[in-house]
């Protein structure tokens, strides 16, 4: 009996030791794989345009978080958490896109949408190049090939080790970033790092950044295009607050040079809630704001007194939401899911905003919808 007990205990010890060794080995692998991309990294500009920018016209620019081609109407994401009206907590399920064919179809859809709008400039976020989660579809290549007469820049903001969570559908290894397109010649581009968490969660989060593309204007100033994707899940919004400060400093520095600045993308901040231009009497709010879910914990709001300087103006619309919560699929929960406007543009005060519109496509290709800004350039300093 004692021998049997010893064998059982010995077997359990070996099994437990093996499990511990695997866990330690995996943690070591994640730690070794982690590195932050250097700040102020010079980016390659793929030059296809021969057009110079004349200040005396109206331009259009789009921004679109394409969600790595995964967020079709039947998709929910494992990191998204929300609460129903009765307080019931709901959590998304998936880490990867369902099928490679679905990623290709979604990517083709977001390309076609922007092509039909014939914009002068375009920002895309969550553009995968070689990721497990998007079945290794090179979305950046697809986008740039479709806009072959545009200059293009790609800045990496997610380069992870193979992540084993969620265990039911591991997200795997990721390579993803921000893609910027311009009909006009981009003279140079740079990647600037955002502050991120210094805790253990940094090993699983994006390497947050914004890409800066400079275009010469015929009045001896620069049009500075900034493609940005701020943090989403930092508790208490402390990291996002630091990122806002970086944005403010960048604006002041560029505007003081007399340059025009368009800072666009996914701010992961509600751009309407405290906006003085969009305060509604009870019952007068847009129809799309009628949903049953409670505001998610991750959603912060832009503070229009603290987060902006005199050099900045928010270009945003309330005609449609730009983001839906992904803690549940859209199908079956269209009237329940929390929706918001977190995508748009903040521009320098020497830019005239002609109009802004959120394109309502029913969240067909992503958990975000595109935003279009028409603008003109005023006199530089």
Give the location of each predicted region.
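Short aromatic-enriched loop/helix-cap "lid" or pocket-rim segments at secondary-structure transitions
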Residues: 72-77, 136-137, 164-168, 193, ...
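Active-site beta-strand/loop signature of hydrolases that rely on acidic residues for catalysis
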Residues: 60-66, 92-96, 106-136, 181, ...
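Metal-dependent phosphoester-hydrolase catalytic domains
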Residues: 6-11, 23-51, 252-262, 269-381
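Solvent-exposed loop/turn segments at secondary-structure junctions
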Residues: 66-69, 127-131, 157-161, 186-187, ...
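Surface-exposed cleft-lining segments at the edges of enzyme active sites
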Residues: 93-99, 127-130, 194-202, 229-238
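Acidic-and-aromatic substrate-binding clefts and catalytic sites of carbohydrate-active enzymes
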Residues: 129-134, 203-204, 234, 335-336, ...
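N-terminal, active-site-proximal structural segment of metallo-dependent hydrolase catalytic domains
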Residues: 4-146, 154-165, 169-175, 379-381
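Beta-strand-turn-beta hairpins that frame and shape the catalytic cleft
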Residues: 51-61, 73, 174-192, 204-228, ...
